[in-house]
């Protein structure tokens, strides 16, 4: 039996970022399908944790439309508190507490179904996120960055290396990745459809990247390797299945991985997100249950079955090799 923190000897502590004690301003960079859906989730669900949602996009007409329409939303009795939605200029973007990266240089067409489409976006999105992170550091940004674009885990590492290259004091926990929440959600979906996977919703866990290398465990108390591998495969392939049906899935990722997980992060609640796991020799942003506390990031401490730990070790080492 082992713990997930055993993957790294002498890990760098995650103690720069702590749970906020007041409402935050969350700024979204790029208002495409994912960014716009994320805005809806944060607006409707985040009023207790967020006072303002800043939005930026290359299209000023889209910014105007979203700002205007969201400001026209109210309940009859004004009984609910909604964040203010505010259009931002590029120079204003990093004036906030949380900067959310939703930009993508390209999204593969629907007829591309041969492999993980997330990795198709890596090289071009890497350039985007590096430039974005450098701009944040240069602007004196004092908050933290949330990466939602694909591939989340690798883009987190790219953003961190870019930020650290400009400011050696930049902590790795000031960048977090949001892609694992929907993989957990898909695991729950299949657990309701097939009794073989029924234990997942209450006993299971998701780990690692949200594409190749994903690790789902049917149960952490009654772990079954064969069932877990089958469930993992179904969840990994769900994206391709959707594309074969003629649509690009973005609603569940934007809400489950994005809005709900970011709100839970701000609230200090357990959430699925990718956090830095590494030392001076090797490192990766690795998805797992974690939460923000007064002293930094706490990862879930589970005594893992040997078979599950070996899968996590393989996934982690592969991420380290990729970047």
Report the location of each language-model feature.
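Conserved N-terminal Rossmann-fold NAD(P) cofactor-binding segment
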Residues: 2-5, 9, 56-96
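Rossmann-like dinucleotide-binding core of oxidoreductases
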Residues: 144-222
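Conserved active-site and cofactor/substrate-binding residues in soluble primary-metabolism enzymes
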Residues: 33, 37, 61, 124-127, ...
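Rossmann-like NAD(P)-binding element
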Residues: 81-144
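Short helix-capping segments at alpha-helix termini
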Residues: 46-48, 74-78, 164-173
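Long, compositionally biased stretches enriched for glycine and/or charged residues
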Residues: 191-323
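NAD(P)+-binding Rossmann beta1-loop-alpha1 motif at the extreme N-terminus of oxidoreductases
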Residues: 2-65
């Amino acid at each position: 039996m082992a713990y997930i923190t055993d993957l790294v000897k002498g890990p760098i502590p995650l103690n720069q970022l702590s749970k906020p004690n007041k409402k935050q301003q969350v700024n979204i960079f790029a208002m495409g399908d994912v960014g716009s859906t994320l805005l809806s989730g944060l607006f409707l669900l985040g009023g207790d944790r967020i006072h303002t949602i800043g939005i930026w996009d290359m299209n000023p007409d889209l910014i105007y439309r979203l700002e205007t329409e969201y400001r026209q939303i109210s309940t009859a009795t004004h009984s609910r508190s909604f964040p203010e939605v505010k259009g931002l200029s590029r120079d204003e973007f990093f004036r906030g507490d949380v900067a959310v990266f939703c930009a993508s240089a390209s999204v593969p067409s629907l007829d591309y179904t041969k492999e993980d489409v997330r990795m198709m976006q890596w090289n071009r999105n890497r350039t985007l996120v590096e430039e974005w992170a450098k701009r944040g550091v240069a602007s004196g940004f004092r908050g933290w960055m949330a990466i939602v674009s694909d591939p989340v885990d690798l883009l987190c590492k790219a953003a961190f290396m870019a930020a650290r290259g400009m400011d050696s004091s930049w902590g790795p926990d000031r960048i977090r990745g949001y892609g694992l929440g929907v993989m957990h959600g898909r695991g729950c979906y299949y657990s309701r459809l097939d009794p073989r996977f029924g234990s997942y919703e209450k006993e299971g866990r998701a780990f690692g990247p949200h594409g190749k290398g994903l690790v789902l465990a049917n149960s952490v108390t009654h772990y079954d390797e064969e069932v877990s591998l089958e469930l993992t495969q179904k969840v990994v392939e769900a994206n391709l299945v959707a594309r074969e049906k003629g649509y690009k899935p973005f609603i569940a990722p934007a809400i489950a991985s994005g809005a709900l997980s970011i709100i839970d992060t701000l609230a200090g609640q357990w959430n699925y997100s990718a956090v830095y796991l590494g030392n001076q020799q090797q490192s990766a942003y690795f998805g797992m249950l974690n939460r923000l506390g007064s002293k930094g990031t706490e990862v879930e401490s589970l005594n893992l079955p040997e078979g599950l730990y070996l899968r996590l070790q393989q996934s982690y080492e592969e991420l380290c090799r990729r970047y």
